[in-house]
Amino acid sequence: MENEAGQLVDLYVPRKCSATNRIIQAKDHASVQINVCAVDAEGRQIPGEKTTYAISGFVRSKGESDDCINRLTTQDGLLEGVWSYQR
């Protein structure tokens, strides 16, 4: 919800899991939000270029968060050449 000035005034903004596209509940204290930055050829961070991933507690409890982060970053072009069991 926004006020007259256009500022966000909600107490809770729901997030979606990047891996499963499920809504992360407010009481899911096992969920994490990870920012992955883009780097240049020298390995330095490019200012302002980051991608945010939200991983739910359900995915983390199954032990699939590492594979999900690898899959998502590879799809977005941030990661190359990672071995995956699925190949």
Curated annotation (Swiss-Prot):
The modification N-acetylmethionine is found at residue 1. It is found in: Cytoplasm; Nucleus. Pfam families: Ribosomal_S21e. GO terms for cellular component: cytosol; cytosolic small ribosomal subunit; nucleus. InterPro entries: Ribosomal_eS21, Ribosomal_eS21_CS, Ribosomal_eS21_sf. Keywords: Acetylation, Cytoplasm, Nucleus, Ribonucleoprotein, Ribosomal protein, rRNA processing. The keyword Amino-acid biosynthesis does not apply. GO terms for molecular function: structural constituent of ribosome. GO terms for biological process: cytoplasmic translational elongation; endonucleolytic cleavage in ITS1 to separate SSU-rRNA from 5.8S rRNA and LSU-rRNA from tricistronic rRNA transcript (SSU-rRNA, 5.8S rRNA, LSU-rRNA); endonucleolytic cleavage to generate mature 3'-end of SSU-rRNA from (SSU-rRNA, 5.8S rRNA, LSU-rRNA); ribosomal small subunit biogenesis. Disruption phenotype: Deficiency of 40S ribosomal subunit formation, this is likely to be caused by insufficient 18S rRNA stability. Component of the small ribosomal subunit (SSU). Mature yeast ribosomes consist of a small (40S) and a large (60S) subunit. The 40S small subunit contains 1 molecule of ribosomal RNA (18S rRNA) and at least 33 different proteins. The large 60S subunit contains 3 rRNA molecules (25S, 5.8S and 5S rRNA) and at least 46 different proteins. Interacts with uS2A and uS2B, strongest interaction is with uS2B. Belongs to the eukaryotic ribosomal protein eS21 family. Component of the ribosome, a large ribonucleoprotein complex responsible for the synthesis of proteins in the cell. The small ribosomal subunit (SSU) binds messenger RNAs (mRNAs) and translates the encoded message by selecting cognate aminoacyl-transfer RNA (tRNA) molecules. The large subunit (LSU) contains the ribosomal catalytic site termed the peptidyl transferase center (PTC), which catalyzes the formation of peptide bonds, thereby polymerizing the amino acids delivered by tRNAs into a polypeptide chain. PANTHER family: 40S RIBOSOMAL PROTEIN S21 (PTHR10442). This is Small ribosomal subunit protein eS21. It comes from Schizosaccharomyces pombe (strain 972 / ATCC 24843) (Fission yeast). The gene is rps21.
